[in-house]
Amino acid sequence: IRRQRQMCIRDRVNDPSVPPNLCFPGKEEVAALVAEITGKKMASVENVTAAVRCSRLDGNVKKQLDYIGYSTCSAAALAYGGPWACKFACLGFGDCVSACPFDAMVLVDGMPQVDPVACVGCGSCVRTCPKGIIELIPSQARVWVPCSNRDSAKAVKAVCEVGCISCRMCVKVCPAKAVTLEEGIIRIDHKKCLDYGTGCDEVCVEKCPQKIFRYYQPAALADKEKRAEAA
């Protein structure tokens, strides 16, 4: 079996259709080596970071039941979707934390927090989350939406104070056309957002009625405040 696995990996690495930059932990150094060994064209490596799209604590999401069982997210998800009234909420048992091979995640008040310095974007947490609410987004992203709820506005407000209500305001005001509503959830084309630059003044954040469209990193907020002072 081990020999077969090695041959499978070798075939994948040598496959011309497979780019040489898929080893996120290895970043550009490993990508360059793979490209050199296989004769493939070097492709840039985008640094990505895990992001948990849930604001259960901010939204004061209540419990729908008291879960008694194995203290894992995978087990809790089988019990009527978990203990929280929002069926898209982070379950809070830390399966993602346990799965992270780089110790880049930790539970704080029952919610996973990501260390952006330690996170290499390997995606182990993404694959582990039974709710599918963890995504990999560019480390330089300016904005994001920490909510995965796909229900109607009425249903969202019944369980969460800050959840996305799919009002499409962000979609309408984004001059870069970087924001879309797909299958009930807001998606951001971060390349379009970053390429457009700060000229939009992050209007998506300002116009969001739920204040769930937020700055992704402190640097983006600091830059916004600096521009406001200079105006």
Model regions and ranges:
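Generic structural signal for hydrophobic core residues of well-folded globular domains
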Residues: 13-14, 38
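Iron-sulfur cluster-binding cysteine motifs and their immediate structural context
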Residues: 9-13, 95-113, 120, 124-141, ...
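Ca2+-coordinating acidic residues in Ca2+-binding motifs
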Residues: 4, 192, 212
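Short microdomains enriched in Cys/His and/or Lys/Arg
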Residues: 16-28, 33, 79-80, 117-128, ...
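Single conserved hydrophobic/aromatic residue that forms the stacking wall/gate
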Residues: 1-9
